[in-house]
Amino acid sequence: LVAYVLISFFDVRPALAIGLMILAACPGGPTSNLITHLCKGDTALSVSLTAVSSILTLFTIPLILEWSVLYYSAQDTVIEINRLDIFKDLLLVSLVPIALGMLIKHYKSDFAVKMEKPVKIASALILLVLIVGLTIKERANIIPYFSEVGLSALSLNIVSLALGFTTARLMGLNKQQSISISIESGIQNGTLAIGIAIGILHNSDYAIPAAVYSLTMFLTAFVLIGLTNWKKSKISKRIFLKFQPFHIVNRL
């Protein structure tokens, strides 16, 4: 629904509109779990939401794809979506990594606790490498891609994050749970979207929004990680104590 409104607002051309709808239909994936962990959210809730949404998308993605192609490209022919291909993509990029993590946590809990800090540091470094790598790989296309769909992709990310957090808080959930729901709502699996666009629908234009989104998503993720961790850092505590009379406390 958010993607549909943004497509109308920014007047996105048909091929990119279909790509945005594909992206919006995808679940969060391991990336959303990683970002939730780095943002000190409820990681267990994030993993559960990803697992459930990944299963649900087996049914919702084909429906959204068929509707999007018919609506935005004004075609009368109904495209056939191979659910088995979607299931294979989901297994590779979402369900298998989640299952491995849950098995390690269950059978090797001491090892999982011991590795928590090193994994957190490594995860942040991997995230940085991914951003740099994507930027270098797509350096020739960054400006054209962003000029076409940059604002709509960034808006999808930010609006979904804000709606997820606000809705969770209004429902009475705590801050950790709200962070998890926010990230799960606002961080889509760009890899899966690209796989569907190119591997199943065989249209590279459909993959452009996901490619742009992958860059903007990682940038907003780093901002979120910085904000959630800055509050607990020694520097932030010193600043807070120094300027406490002028500090506006965020009670959300």
Label the model's feature ranges.
Residues 1-252:
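Alpha-helical transmembrane segments of multi-pass small-molecule/ion transporters
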